[in-house]
Amino acid sequence: MYFKRYLQLAKPGIIFGNLITLTGGFLLATHREIGFEYLPLFVYVMIGVALMIAAGCVFNNIYDKDIDSSMTRTQNRPLVTGDISVIQATIYGTILLILSCLVLYYLVILLTLWIIIIGFIVYVGIYTVSKRLTIHATVLGGISGAIPPVAGYTAVVNILDYNALALFLILFFWQIPHSYAIAMLYIDDYKKVKLPMLPIVKGIAYTKKIMLFYLALFVVSCALPAVLGSADLFSFIVCMLVALFWMYKSIQSYRTDTDRVFAKTVFKFSIIVITVICLTMG
């Protein structure tokens, strides 16, 4: 029972999603090969990054305890129900953070460790705090969310180059419509706790247009790995097809569906699209 509650505190769904994007960066660097040569490194970087993301989620839960208790979708989180105390969560998060640093420092490379630490700082120190203050918090959070594929890539090549930037942009532009779709779906919860989310402050109509704008940027960014010569023709075709398909379905829903159906459409296909792109990268 306690294991389940501690696992819930680390938000395994977020960890899993980020590890998929990390895999995309790793595959781009190895040209879709994870044989015996790269398998140990792949396992180590996955573990190290997973621990850091888990630590970030734990500290996010600690800071958000007060607003989580007022929102329907978060009111059963362990800190809200009292199954785990703030002190226990702080110790847990600190242990995860230390373990992550040890794994990445000793078993991966220092560059990847620093990149992941930056992502942690942005998520916990900037995004978590700023989402109570500004409508731009989602964009700031997009920075931390775009870090895992860069970490996966640098773990192999040990350098920050244009390919790393391309991976960052793909995930950054993907995250904005994905996150705003969630904001639209749970807008009533966010209104309860007075969070200045874009759909609340600027309205649904404006938010939908912004989502399509970032979606268009995402489609363009998907061509970058091939343009830079790091991705092959197969990867380029798959990436562009699924990105354009997401764009098409979103525009179609924008024109014909209700706001909620539009948000569900964007969210549903965002998961499918990023998974396919990351697993065929290389």
Swiss-Prot record:
The gene is cyoE. It comes from the Bacteria. One of its GO terms (cellular component) is plasma membrane. Keywords: Cell inner membrane, Cell membrane, Heme biosynthesis, Membrane, Transferase, Transmembrane, Transmembrane helix. GO terms for biological process: heme O biosynthetic process. It is found in: Cell inner membrane. Its EC number is 2.5.1.141. Carbon 2 of the heme B porphyrin ring is defined according to the Fischer nomenclature. Converts heme B (protoheme IX) to heme O by substitution of the vinyl group on carbon 2 of heme B porphyrin ring with a hydroxyethyl farnesyl side group. The lineage of its organism: Bacteria, Pseudomonadati, Pseudomonadota, Gammaproteobacteria, Thiotrichales. Belongs to the UbiA prenyltransferase family. Protoheme IX farnesyltransferase subfamily. The keyword Transport does not apply. The chain crosses the membrane at residues 9-29, 39-59, 79-99, 102-122, 139-159, 165-185, 210-230, 231-251, 261-281. It catalyses: heme b + (2E,6E)-farnesyl diphosphate + H2O = Fe(II)-heme o + diphosphate. InterPro entries: Protohaem_IX_farnesylTrfase, UbiA_prenyltransferase, UbiA_prenylTrfase_CS, UbiA_sf. The keyword Calcium does not apply. This is Protoheme IX farnesyltransferase.
